[in-house]
């Protein structure tokens, strides 16, 4: 009988540790590839962080995946119009944990109108300083980019995402 082997019905007893499994993507190794995530994306591996607390296990998983944790707590947001309401909620959360938010004009206006502090920066094709100066100057820890449809806008989004990966953002 299974019971004779020491197994009991029900859930496994709670462990005294946390385990966090994290996917690993090889974006930086695939030059000139668009790194936007979609449902068809597959990771090239995974790593595991194990510790006595969830925060420490998550930290170890980030380190194992090669993800650098923020140095400056600066972020760029540039989102399409239909994503602005959701961007406001995300902006509020990041502002609450101490992030300084740089955003393109339309996104900055949406954030500011909702009470989120945002510093407007120029788009790629506009004069410097622009958002690429911040990324290439290694002043940014996080980029949230949801580019609108269309060839020119898609090109901008590609450049933003690719530059972020290549500079370790």
Where are the language model's segments positioned?
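ATP-dependent carboxylate/acyl-activation modules
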Residues: 1-169
